[in-house]
From Swiss-Prot:
Subcellular location: Cytoplasm, Cytoskeleton, Microtubule organizing center, Centrosome; Cytoplasm, Cytoskeleton, Microtubule organizing center, Centrosome, Centriole; Cytoplasm, Cytoskeleton, Microtubule organizing center, Centrosome, Centriolar satellite; Cytoplasm, Cytoskeleton, Cilium basal body
UniProt record, GO biological process: cell projection organization; negative regulation of cilium assembly
GO terms for cellular component: centriolar satellite; centriole; centrosome; ciliary basal body; cytoplasm
Protein name (record): Protein BCAP
Annotated family: Belongs to the ODF2 family.
Physiological role: Acts as a suppressor of ciliogenesis, specifically, the initiation of ciliogenesis.
Signal sequence segment: none
Record InterPro entries: Odf2-rel
Residues forming coiled coils: 31-58, 128-226, 254-603
Keywords of the record: Cell projection, Cilium biogenesis/degradation, Coiled coil, Cytoplasm, Cytoskeleton
Amino acid sequence: MEMPTSDGSLSEGLISYLIRERGSAPQCAPEKHLSRLKQDVANTKMELKATLKEAQLASCSVELLLPLFKNTVEGISLENANLSASSLKKIFEQNDILSKELDTFNRVKLALEHLIKQTDYEQIGDSLLCLLKDLSDNESENRNLEEKVLEKETYIRELSCLFQNEKESALKANRLSQSVKVVHDRLQRQIQKREAENEKLKEHVQSLETQIAKWNLQVKMNKQEAVAIKEASRQKAVALKKASKVYRQRLRHFTGDIERLASQVRDQEAKLSETVSASSDWKSQFEKIAIEKTELEVQIETMKKQIANLLEDLRKMETHGKNSCEEILRKLHSLEDENEALNIENVKLKGTLDALKDEVASVENELVELQEVEKRQKTLVEGYRTQVQKLQEAAEMVKSRCKNLLHENNLIITNKNKKLEKMRGQVESNLKQVEQARSSFTSAEQRLQECQEKLQRCKEKCAEQALTIRELQGQVDGNQSLLTKLSLEEENHLIQLKCENLKEKLEQMDAENKELEKKLADQEECLKHSDLELKEKAAEYTALSRQLEAALEEGRQKVSEEVEKMSSRERALQIKILDLEAELRKKNEEQNQLVDKMNTKTQHQAICLKEIQHSLEKSETRNESIKNYLQFLQISYVTMFR
């Protein structure tokens, strides 16, 4: 039901589009032709409306008949009985009505197709005639415009040739001025680089001085700590000697008392033998002996208590010795940490040496760049000479000035070459000094490695001593039951021997520390010597930089004079170039206007063609949609009657 309305609106849209399209092109179609087209379009519109109304009526009747036909068929299928005469009549009547309506649909379809084809052919013919006229007119206009464009292009080419010739002369002058400016900028950059390198060297020297001061303070602190350790070890050794003497005296007293008691026991045993022989006197003397025995047992218990106290004192001394050994080990660990810090600082110094090497390499690269710049300057000078020979007829005064400038440049180049040779000699001497400093640093590193090995050996010795002390402690703990049987003098003698061995080892450590101090002092002297050499080199660099600045100032003055002369010429050339550019802009604007006109016409033609194609596509789609709709209706009727 919606198809006719949509077709009507689309036909109206096509009519309005054709009217607008033909109204927008008054040059192609006259007013009479437009009025005829309007009448034809109105007639076709009326015919299309009539056919569309017929199609609407047919579709409405079909819609009304289809549900009735469905109901009858469903009623017959539901009753499941034989068909009666009335039902057959109804079916035949509905079949006749549907066949009539299908015939009307076919007639409407044929009429619509015929009308659509007629309207399409008429529209396409009219549009083609108009387009052919437009194309002929546009071709004639395009030919005229192409002729004008060719004339303008020839004129523009002549102007561009003149402009390029003047541009080349201006570029030559600019190149001369730019080469002088480039040399000036490079010299300024080299001076700035040298100043930055000098500042870096000063900062590096200051950092080295601060590091040397820190090392001196650390060495002093290490010396003070070593002296304190020595004094503490001496005091501990004296205290151990005194304690050993006191223990020896006590042991002697105890041994004397034990011998006396043993003699007394022997005497009493002899007396007991006599009492056994004399049984008569046994009872009387037994009480006396029992009393004396109790007294002796009391004395033995007191002696045992004294021995236990002595053993506790020995244990305390052993613990004190252990603590002292642990303190010594801690101090050794601290010394090892300090040595590691010194190694780290040596690594940092190596890094600074590598940085100095890189700086020397950069200086060498700069020298190579300067040589390349000299070669380029020589090539430029040769090019300038050839240009001067070509321009001798036009500028004899300029030739004389250029010769003078070339002579001055050659003198400056020779002076620079001499200075560069001096700088090379100085750099080579500096490299030799750096290699000597490297060798001194390598020797110092070897010495430090030897010191580290010695410290490791001392650590191993201390560990062995700690193991021996632990073994002695285990022996003391295991042999507590045998202390009464063994002699304490031998143990004291062994302790004294161990104390003497420890003293000898401490003396060896003191000697090694003194050697390390001497090595550190030698390294400090080497560093001071290297600092003095660096200061001397910095002074030499400053003097050379001053000389270079003086030479550069002279060159700058000469360059400024040449730049002023070249600037006056450049201004005159720029004025001419601006005039030519203004003329070119005007001509380019005219050409652009012509091109825009051509483009607008071509775009208008393309738009018209696209719109016509679009309208044709729409009409084709409508025809296809109508055909599909009719086919759908036919298929639906066929399926229903089957």
